[in-house]
């Protein structure tokens, strides 16, 4: 990320502000809050699933590597073949991910243990995740979103610049699952974006996230379907992008730029 600093100082400086942990609201903020302490019933609801061990509200992008490394959900693997989670869990955490996918192949990247790639995935979410380094155009750097569009008969390369201001976020801020033994990252959008559409998709595939330890019931746990909800809501219907509110334009010294301190819009209300 640091290589972009000299050419894009304003964007870089505001991006570093995602390290801040100084804002809270009723709808989260940038402070890690222990949700299991707030809502201990969730430990029972998630019995048998990794989230019953640890679940905190998210912090900013600069904490991505730190937080996934510290969470109890990824365990403490001692070797490259140890640990409870696949390397798929790295997918949205670093611009090192596309580099490794190109180096070893997408299938090999997913079909590995999380601990196996820890010495390669070291830079937090940053510039190259959303921008083409050669020209800084917005681009899609993760295959799962492209593949989800293809299964719906859509060509993501035809997206408008305004649509791209949301699609770069849709690489990660979505519902997803790890498909098959290869733990292949997949978005369940084939039938649509609604809860009912995704439930029908999962039912047809026979997929569930875990078997509840107490009731022995197969359970689906939604992840973070931010993009889907936005697209079905008034914002998506009116053509408002994620960046319009979460990365508003600013002016400094006569220069207009997008604020890369990606955060809750509630923190920016004058």
Model-predicted segments: where are they?
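Long, structured ligand/cofactor-binding scaffold of large enzymes
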Residues: 86-89, 96
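Primarily the internal scaffold of c-type cytochrome electron-transfer domains
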Residues: 1-59, 102-124, 128-129, 133-244, ...
């Amino acid at each position: 990320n640091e290589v972009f600093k000299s050419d894009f100082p304003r964007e870089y400086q505001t991006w570093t502000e995602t390290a801040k942990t100084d804002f809270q609201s009723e709808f989260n903020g940038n402070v890690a809050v222990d949700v299991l302490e707030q809502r201990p019933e969730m430990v029972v609801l998630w019995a048998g699933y990794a989230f019953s061990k640890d679940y905190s509200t998210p912090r900013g992008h600069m904490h991505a590597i730190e937080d996934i490394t510290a969470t109890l959900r990824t365990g403490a693997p001692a070797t490259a073949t140890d640990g409870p989670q696949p390397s798929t869990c790295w997918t949205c955490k670093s611009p090192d991910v596309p580099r490794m996918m190109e180096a070893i192949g997408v299938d090999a990247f997913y079909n590995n243990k999380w601990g196996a790639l820890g010495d390669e995935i070291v830079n937090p979410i940053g510039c190259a995740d959303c921008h083409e380094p050669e020209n800084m155009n917005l681009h899609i750097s993760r295959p799962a979103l492209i593949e989800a569009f293809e299964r719906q008969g859509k060509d993501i390369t035809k997206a408008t610049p305004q649509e791209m201001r949301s699609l770069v976020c849709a690489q990660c801020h979505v519902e997803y699952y790890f498909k098959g033994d290869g733990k292949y990252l997949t978005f369940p959008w084939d039938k649509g974006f609604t809860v009912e559409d995704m439930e029908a998709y999962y039912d047809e595939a026979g997929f569930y996230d875990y078997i509840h330890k107490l009731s022995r019931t197969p359970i689906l746990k939604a992840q973070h379907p931010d993009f889907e909800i936005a697209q079905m809501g008034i914002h998506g219907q009116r053509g408002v992008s994620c960046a319009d509110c979460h990365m508003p334009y600013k002016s400094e010294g006569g220069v207009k730029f997008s604020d890369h301190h990606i955060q809750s819009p509630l923190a920016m209300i004058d």
